[in-house]
């Protein structure tokens, strides 16, 4: 195995359980604004809609504002909400709940603690800055992360190669063999690594083009230590 120096870790569904975070925040939002208790099926419907919009954003087919408006408009339609839908208010309340909801995987703290003894850890994430910073403040593994790179602040989303420019500006190390991208998304994280000629570790199951693969984040020290 190469002598990596920098681990570029995805945030959501890699270190943090975003599926559960999303479920809680969405439920609180629709209960507050519409007095509605969402079913698991309805939450799954939103998950699919939201994921679709994020994939379109990665492909530069929509803007961030179109994503925010479209996902809530489409979801409200699926729920049969027929009155005028104020997507701006729904998104604002939803993201406020997201920023306060911290659900990390049980192994994340110990994984980051152990790996930080050998590697420099960075987080690379597509997301809204105040939401990601808010959740990071409550993360137990925060002391072991050197810096968080957020698409909102950089101005581009993974898998765009330009995202890596921000990382290089921070490290000053142009040797791409020193980096490893770790994440759960084939279209965002793994493709990003391929786009910038950096090795990748896919967190998940199934066939994939990554350099390495682990079932979940708890297995990362076994691979790298």
Task: For every predicted segment, state its role.
Residues 107-118:
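Catalytic-core regions built around general acid/base machinery
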């Amino acid at each position: 195995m190469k002598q990596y120096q920098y681990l570029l870790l995805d945030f959501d569904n890699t270190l943090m359980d975003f599926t559960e975070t999303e479920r809680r925040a969405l439920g609180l939002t629709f209960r507050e604004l519409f007095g509605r208790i969402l079913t698991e099926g309805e939450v799954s419907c939103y998950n699919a809609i939201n994921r679709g919009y994020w994939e379109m954003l990665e492909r530069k087919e929509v803007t961030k504002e179109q994503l925010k408006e479209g996902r809530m408009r489409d979801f409200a339609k699926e729920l049969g909400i027929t009155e005028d839908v104020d997507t701006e208010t729904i998104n604002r309340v939803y993201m406020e709940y997201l920023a306060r909801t911290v659900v990390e995987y049980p192994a994340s703290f110990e994984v980051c603690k152990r790996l930080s003894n050998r590697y420099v850890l960075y987080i690379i994430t597509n997301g809204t800055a105040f939401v990601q910073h808010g959740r990071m403040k409550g993360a137990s593994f925060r002391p072991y992360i050197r810096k968080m790179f957020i698409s909102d602040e950089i101005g581009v989303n993974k898998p765009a190669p330009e995202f890596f420019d921000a990382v290089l500006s921070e490290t000053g190390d142009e040797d791409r063999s020193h980096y490893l991208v770790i994440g759960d998304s084939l279209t965002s994280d793994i493709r990003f690594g391929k786009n910038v000629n950096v090795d990748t570790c896919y967190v998940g199951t199934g066939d994939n083009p990554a350099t390495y693969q682990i079932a979940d984040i708890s297995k990362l020290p076994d691979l790298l230590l």
